């Protein structure tokens, strides 16, 4: 059986739950996997945030060029959703005058083949000093308080705890929820008043969640073999 990873955004939402609630959430996610991805926007984060090799800017990418690339996505819903959040992020970074500098942070290893990332490979310099930003592009069902706490804790462990220039960096998450009229907005949360989760607890939460997740996937594979339907519930990573 191919062991499909959970999206990091789903892990942050599900891992802090109590065991029974965690299993229910994993079953619900398995049965309702989204029909499109925000990966096209994630791949364009350096352009959207105007991330530079250093504090000296080498020029900006025009929004029209990014939009043109996203319009070529074959899935119309995916194209429209990615364009919507990408433009919001593009404008947010420039209106708030953040300067993004490339930094290959990599992923936080949690063991058992699990590695997570709630940040882009850039550090953002603004009026309050350096900030680490993670991005949740979902319209609904995005980070709640406990999921943000999980993500902030991962940011702290992987980047602040390195003991380098970013030990005092602010921790931030940028979300793009929908308003009642259906339009999206930028919502920014910081970890200033959040009690962070210790690293060993973070690892335990992730391992317990993945243990149940792999069990659910294995049961699904067994059912498919018995009924002759074959294949996995999910055809790609």
UniProtKB/Swiss-Prot annotation:
One of its GO terms (cellular component) is cytoplasm. Its main location: cytoplasm. It is found in: Cytoplasm. Keywords: Cytoplasm, Toxin-antitoxin system. Disruption phenotype: Deletion of this gene allows growth of cells disrupted for clpP or clpX, deletions which are otherwise lethal. Induction: Induced by DNA damaging agent mitomycin C, part of the socA-socB operon. Degraded by ClpXP, recognition of SocB by ClpX requires SocA. Toxic component of an atypical type II toxin-antitoxin (TA) system. Upon overexpression in the absence of its cognate antitoxin SocA, leads to inhibition of colony formation, cellular filamentation, incomplete DNA replication and induction of the SOS response. Exercises toxicity by binding the beta sliding clamp (dnaN), blocking DNA replication and leading to premature replication fork collapse and incomplete cell division. Unlike most type II TA systems, the SocB toxin is unstable and targeted by its cognate antitoxin SocA for degradation by ClpXP. Not toxic upon expression in E.coli. Interacts with cognate antitoxin SocA and with beta sliding clamp (dnaN). This is DNA replication inhibitor toxin SocB.
């Amino acid at each position: 059986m191919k062991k499909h990873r959970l999206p990091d955004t789903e892990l942050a939402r599900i891992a802090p739950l109590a065991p029974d609630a965690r299993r229910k959430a994993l079953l619900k996610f398995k049965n309702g996997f989204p029909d499109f991805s925000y990966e096209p926007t994630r791949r364009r984060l350096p352009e959207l945030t105007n991330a530079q090799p250093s504090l000296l800017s080498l020029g900006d990418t025009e929004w029209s060029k990014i939009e043109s690339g996203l319009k070529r996505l074959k899935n119309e819903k995916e194209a429209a959703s990615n364009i919507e959040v990408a433009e919001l992020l593009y404008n947010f970074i420039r209106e708030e005058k953040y300067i993004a500098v490339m930094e290959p942070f990599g992923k936080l290893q949690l063991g058992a083949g699990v590695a997570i990332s709630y940040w882009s490979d850039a550090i953002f310099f603004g009026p309050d000093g350096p900030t680490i930003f993670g991005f949740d592009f979902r319209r609904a069902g995005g980070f709640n308080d406990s999921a943000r706490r999980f993500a902030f804790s991962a940011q702290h462990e992987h980047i602040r705890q390195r003991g380098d220039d970013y030990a005092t960096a602010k921790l931030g998450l940028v979300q793009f929820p929908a308003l009642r009229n259906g339009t999206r907005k930028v919502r920014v949360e910081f970890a200033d008043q959040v009690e962070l989760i210790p690293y060993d607890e973070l690892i335990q939460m992730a391992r317990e969640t993945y243990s149940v997740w792999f069990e659910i996937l294995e049961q699904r594979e067994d059912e498919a073999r018995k009924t002759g339907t074959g294949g996995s519930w999910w055809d790609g990573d």
